[in-house]
Amino acid sequence: MLVLGIESSCDETAAAVVNDRREILGEVVLSQLDEHRPFGGVVPEIAARSHLAHMDKLVAEAMRRAGVGFADLDAVAATGGPGLIGGVIVGVMTGKAIALAAGKPFLAVNHLEGHALTPRLTHDIAFPYLLLLASGGHCQLLAVEGVGRYTRLGTTIDDAAGEAFDKVAKMAGLGYPGGPAVEAAAQGGDPARFTLPRPMKGKPGCDFSFSGLKNAARLLIESLPQPLSAADQADVARAFQDAVADAMADRVRRGVREMKSRWPQTQHLVVAGGVAANTALRQVLVRIGNETGLEFLAPPLKLCTDNAAMIAWAGLERLRLGQSDDLTFAPRPRWPLDPTARKGAKA
């Protein structure tokens, strides 16, 4: 099987061709970082216009690199949500047009499902597994029971981890995007100088919270001489990164206990999403895996951030089950993975 994937839910425009042997035959990702950096975050209107300007040639380049034509495809998959709706519309309409013209099935892929199934693109693992999905817009602990079968064990009750990284980096003058900037600065930081709170640590359940930590970091930054010296930036970054990793570790340990109780056959703890690229977080998760007897797996760094290979793979997984979507599918700004999510829940 051969599937073209299209991703345009935020600030990466991407296209990829993937086969059922877990091979990425052709892949192109165009980042919009330079367009959004002056604003310190993603501007939806700019993102949508950039997707529209570049999508066609990126699809053509991915197909060229794969050495295939549209007639060779078995299906076309595009992110159908959740995400910034302008960009999602661009990707969905492009995917529909190609599918219609080539006479191929169309699959609207949940962006979160793309992340959730990425470990099966990079590793030969069976269901179920415990997934920590941490990105700029999402922070969830999910029991991945199968394609289209997800149980949310925990979620953020306010801000996502990646959003907190971006805001703290901006307040500390570290630049954008915040995740890599904080991690780079933290490498030279003194872990003993500042201590920030560990939100939700020790509390029942598996939910996350980062709003209070973000505010504590703001108060710390404002208490220091302005503008921050390089040493102060490094120490603040280290304190913040350590707090995030420690708080998330507590939630994940609780998630492992619940996972083993409800799905005792679980063998893997996996992480996906842009925050999964953080080395400190990965080190903590490796330790948790060793402590609990679960094998820790993480996709390569390039597949942690938004990409089209994961969308193609999720589409391929659905296609193998005989699934496809009608061309009347409407793009969705919110689209929770688990069907029992409360109304209004963050996707």
UniProtKB/Swiss-Prot annotation:
Substrate binds at residues 133-137, 166, 179, 278. The gene is tsaD. Belongs to the KAE1 / TsaD family. One of its GO terms (molecular function) is N(6)-L-threonylcarbamoyladenine synthase activity. It comes from the Bacteria. Keywords: Acyltransferase, Cytoplasm, Iron, Metal-binding, Transferase, tRNA processing. Its EC number is 2.3.1.234. HAMAP family: TsaD. CDD domains: ASKHA_NBD_TsaD_bac. One of its GO terms (cellular component) is cytoplasm. It is an enzyme of class 2 (transferase). It comes from Paramagnetospirillum magneticum (strain ATCC 700264 / AMB-1). It is found in: Cytoplasm. Binds 1 Fe(2+) ion per subunit. Its cofactor is Fe(2+). InterPro entries: ATPase_NBD, Gcp-like_dom, KAE1/TsaD, TsaD. Fe cation binds at residues 111, 115, 306. One of its GO terms (biological process) is tRNA threonylcarbamoyladenosine modification. This is tRNA N6-adenosine threonylcarbamoyltransferase. Required for the formation of a threonylcarbamoyl group on adenosine at position 37 (t(6)A37) in tRNAs that read codons beginning with adenine. Is involved in the transfer of the threonylcarbamoyl moiety of threonylcarbamoyl-AMP (TC-AMP) to the N6 group of A37, together with TsaE and TsaB. TsaD likely plays a direct catalytic role in this reaction.
